[in-house]
C-alpha cells in the first residue's frame, strides 16, 4: 500500500505474506513445541493441564516425534523389576538411549528368567499327505510360551521346556548393553525383556 507523507509517495512493501492463525492452531503449535523441547508443563494453567492427555492423543495421530517424547517420559518411570512387555514407544526410546540414564543405579542385580522352548508341533499336510514339523522360537517369555501351548494342544505335539533362572550383579554400563541387546529379549514378541532389574540394598 502507499502512504502520503507531504509531497512524497512512500511505498510500503511486505517482505512476508500476512498469515492469520486460528487461536486453537497457535495453542497446538506452542504446546507441541513445548513437548518436543521437554519443557516443564507444571507451570501451565490447570485448565490446560487437565487437557494434556487429550491433546497428547491428538498429536500422536499426527506426529510421531511427540510419540518419541512420550515414550522417553514413560521410560524414566518404567518398572523393570517386573517382567512385562513394553509399549512400542517405550521400547524404541530404550533402544535409542546413547548414555547411561539417571534411573539406573551404579550397580544392580539382573535376574535373567526365560523359557527355553524345546517343544515341537506336527500338523498333517493334506497336500503332501505327511506330517510337517513346525519350527518354534526357543528363547521366549512366559506369556508367549502360554500362547504357543494353547495352539500346540490343538495339534499333534510334544511339550518340552526348560526354565532358565539366575541372578548376577552388573554395572550400569553393562546393564545398558543388556537392555539394548536383542539376545536378552523374547524372540517371539521382541518387546518383553527376559530379565528384571533389582536394586541392591546396602
Swiss-Prot record:
The protein's name: Non-structural protein NS3
InterPro entries: NS3
Superkingdom: Viruses
Gene name tied to this protein: NS3
Organism (species): Diatraea saccharalis densovirus
Amino acid at each position: 500500500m502507499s502512504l502520503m507523507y507531504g509531497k512524497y509517495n512512500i511505498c510500503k512493501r511486505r517482505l512476508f505474506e500476512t498469515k492469520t492463525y486460528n487461536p486453537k492452531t497457535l495453542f497446538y503449535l506452542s504446546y507441541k513445541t513445548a513437548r518436543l523441547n521437554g519443557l516443564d508443563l507444571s507451570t501451565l494453567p490447570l485448565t490446560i493441564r487437565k487437557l494434556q492427555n487429550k491433546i497428547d492423543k491428538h498429536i500422536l495421530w499426527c506426529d510421531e516425534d511427540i510419540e518419541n517424547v512420550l515414550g522417553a517420559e514413560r521410560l524414566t518411570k518404567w518398572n523393570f523389576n517386573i517382567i512385562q512387555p513394553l509399549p512400542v514407544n517405550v521400547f524404541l526410546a530404550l533402544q535409542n538411549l546413547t548414555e547411561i540414564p539417571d534411573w539406573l543405579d551404579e550397580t544392580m542385580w539382573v535376574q535373567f528368567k526365560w523359557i527355553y522352548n524345546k517343544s515341537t508341533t506336527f500338523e498333517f499336510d493334506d497336500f503332501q499327505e505327511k506330517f510337517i514339523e513346525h519350527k518354534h522360537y526357543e528363547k521366549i517369555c512366559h506369556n508367549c510360551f502360554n500362547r504357543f501351548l494353547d495352539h500346540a494342544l490343538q495339534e499333534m505335539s510334544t511339550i518340552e521346556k526348560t526354565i532358565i533362572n539366575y541372578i548376577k550383579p552388573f554395572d550400569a554400563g553393562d546393564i545398558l548393553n543388556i537392555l539394548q541387546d536383542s539376545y536378552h529379549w523374547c524372540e517371539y514378541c521382541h518387546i518383553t525383556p527376559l530379565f528384571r532389574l533389582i536394586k541392591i540394598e546396602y
